[in-house]
Amino acid sequence: MKIINSDLEKIAFLIEQYPDESLPEIAFCGRSNVGKSSFINSILDRKNLARTSSKPGKTRTVNFYNANNEFRLVDLPGYGYAQTSKSEKKKWAQVIETYLNNRRNLYEVFLIVDIRHKPTVQDKEMYNWIIQSGFCGFVIATKLDKIGKTMIKKNLNIIKKELNIDDDNLIYEYSSTSKTNKKAVMEQLEMILKYGSGIEE
């Protein structure tokens, strides 16, 4: 699958602001500053399409990225930023929940984690929701270029243990800088789009 054209189709805070459901969507969730926007940029081959920041909490809206006018990648607000007020955290959580619970054209939800760190309680809760909702449970372990090669297997095993992942095919170590494993991820996205949602009807 080759993405020729892509753009930021919609920025939404409320459900009324979402684009129509004519295209399949694949959503990406994860804690703040985990590298979701950089991952989406690398997948779409667009350096600055998804806004990135070294400061956590940059993505506060649901951002819809149109690819080839055939499907959308959806960047959900990051969760778990410690310096955010309780009311703000609740607001972000509601934005995420509203999207995930109401989108009929949602084909799959990926959890994005930082390969350098053990998944948080919120990561586990999010992953459990993904599985319980009938999705496959794919995980992207980003920032691969930030650790030594000898640590990769060890860190992946920690992530798999914490999230109770038994199938190695569900987790991809990934570098948005070198685009390591981009081909494998693109093939997986193509399979999802071809065969539809992981949800059992």
Swiss-Prot record:
Cofactor or coenzyme needed: Mg(2+)
Xref: Gene3D superfamilies: P-loop containing nucleotide triphosphate hydrolases (3.40.50.300)
Cysteines paired by S-S bonds: none
UniProt: GTP binding residues: 30-37, 57-61, 75-78, 142-145, 174-176
GO MF term set: GTP binding; metal ion binding
InterPro entries, sorted: G_ENGB_dom, GTP-bd, GTP-bd_ribosome_bio_YsxC, P-loop_NTPase
Residues reported to bind Mg(2+): 37, 59
Annotated function: Necessary for normal cell division and for the maintenance of normal septation.
Pfam families: MMR_HSR1 (PF01926)
One GO cellular component term: cytosol
Family to which this protein belongs: Belongs to the TRAFAC class TrmE-Era-EngA-EngB-Septin-like GTPase superfamily. EngB GTPase family.
Alphabetized NCBIfam families for the sequence: GTPase_YsxC
Swiss-Prot/TrEMBL keywords: Cell cycle, Cell division, GTP-binding, Magnesium, Metal-binding, Nucleotide-binding, Septation
This protein's name: Probable GTP-binding protein EngB
Protein's GO biological process: division septum assembly
The keyword Hydrolase appears for this protein: no
Residue span, EngB-type G domain: 22-195
Cross-referenced PROSITE patterns: G_ENGB
Keyword Nucleus belongs to the record: no
Signal peptide: none
